[in-house]
Regions:
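Glycine-rich phosphate/cofactor-binding loops in nucleotide/flavin-utilizing enzymes
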Residues: 66-67, 162, 170-179
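Hydrophobic alpha-helical segments of membrane proteins
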Residues: 158-166
Length: 179
């Protein structure tokens, strides 16, 4: 379509049983397999659909994408927090079952503090994501962008920090295939 760059894309619905649509398999996002409802690798070969399958109208594809962007970012953050939660669970389990110097690993050095700080960070991330989601619900996506940007910046960084601590907590087992 003619017009400014943000009005040159359209989105269409393609039924999965349309001739030429081939599902190649599920895709993993952050190590998570969301099949059969998640992301799929799909091949389109000479697929044809009626113009009535266009969403909102010609040139409004970017608008649709923008509407999904904030919620999508929130969703990715929530999944990342789940990964951080799993890392904490693994640290606690390792700390309570592994011994060194005749003490549980959790009681050595600053290990209890590491786990406690990780818990604090997960709770803070959850509250920030909740705040961003509430802003989207009450203010709309455009006005909530500062909150969405904040969680998009904060959550991945903090989750990586927590996961790194879990790797360190496990020593060599944190990077080997034998654990």
């Amino acid at each position: 379509p003619d017009g400014p760059p943000h009005r040159k894309q359209s989105q269409i619905l393609v039924p999965i049983d349309t001739p030429g649509v081939e599902i190649l398999g599920p895709m993993y996002v952050f190590g998570n397999d969301d099949a059969p409802h998640g992301h799929m690798h799909i091949r389109f070969t000479d697929v044809r659909v009626p113009a009535s399958n266009m969403l909102l109208g010609e040139g409004r594809g970017f608008e649709i994408s923008q509407l999904r962007l904030g919620p999508g970012r929130i969703h990715h953050c929530m999944r990342s927090i789940g990964s951080a939660e799993k890392a904490i669970e693994m640290m606690v389990d390792r700390g309570l079952t592994r011994e060194g110097f005749n003490k549980k690993l959790i009681n050595l050095g600053k290990n209890m503090e590491v786990v406690s700080r990780a818990r604090i960070e997960v709770e803070a991330m959850r509250l920030m994501v909740l705040r961003a989601a509430k802003a989207m619900d009450t203010l709309g996506n455009a006005e909530a962008r500062i909150w969405v940007s904040a969680v998009k910046a904060m959550v991945p960084e903090k989750c990586c920090d927590i996961i790194n601590e879990a790797i360190q907590f496990h020593g060599a087992a944190g990077i080997s295939q034998w654990f």
